[in-house]
């Protein structure tokens, strides 16, 4: 996934995940009427604050599914897709700037998975419906994994704000130098500094030798956009990028396998097409064909097709999503410094995820096949996804898993 993955958070220890799990153990022992205003729920907010410095309050009074209300800081954040951008704004961010008597400062540390400064002051609300978090459907570990995923939404949102601000600062500084200097040598030094700061290794500075400041800014921004694409030429900020980064945030805190089992339960409860037997799959598709033959049922058909769709919504296909969570475990095995106990734990998690993947299929709706046949863009996107997944398989192949197994055998 190009630069996006290279700047992901580092692998963390499991303390954050373990503390969340213990808090959910206590939540499960409460009466449903007592959950919303309980000490364990407040403690979840404190645990999040302690490990990330993020200021997140938990709302367990309602029955919303797990989600986080992202503050309206910057509607132009690259992680927000075009459809979302049409209905969000930057009011919170503008209010912060207008009400502050000094320059706002903040950092996002991807090595420690912590924020500081203004990012630790911004308030956000996470919804964990009491009906969802109680009962026996989801274990405390699965709830902790889901919570980490939602925390990841806010963390990565702030991370991409810092990237945008960094770019703006470089461009502003460059403009000031270029506007105030006719000296060609100073221009070249300034452009070279901007190239290094923005990590535009492939940019040819000779094309900027005799152009004005505004054109220079346009060229640099265009180069940055191209840098956000993968080597395959597909936009890096695809709809699934944000969800993928949040899954990764959870997995890199040691919750990968529990996130995978939670997702499997969610997919099954939604009767996802990936879990249907051949007989059920064919029966459902036949019903859709029958509905399309009757104009009176077209509205119902549209609803059924939308609910049954595997496309859009910002998520990978179920099997691809679990496979990418598995890849995080494989990536961790590349660390030669981990203990045999850790290595055994990761291998067990990979085995568990493999069992979940074995239950899935990659079936698509009949209407999806028809759409792909008539839409070249859709075919190209499917081909890109397939190639991207194949390249990821090469990078995260099972040689690392087998090597870890042999290492354990050699140490026994």
Q: Language-model features: where?
A:
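Low-complexity, serine/threonine/proline-enriched polar segments
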Residues: 80-82, 87-89, 105, 186-221, ...
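A metal-dependent hydrolase signature that marks the N-terminal structural subdomain at the beginning
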Residues: 1-99
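Short consensus segments that form the blades of beta-propeller domains
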Residues: 34-36, 135-136, 239
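Active-site scaffold of zinc-dependent metalloenzymes
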Residues: 69-147, 151-161
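Cytosolic-facing loops and C-terminal tails of multi-pass membrane proteins
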Residues: 2-35, 92, 262-412
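Hydrophobic alpha-helical membrane segments
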Residues: 157, 165, 172, 226, ...
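Catalytic Zn2+-binding segment of zinc metalloproteases
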Residues: 141, 148-173, 180, 185-189, ...
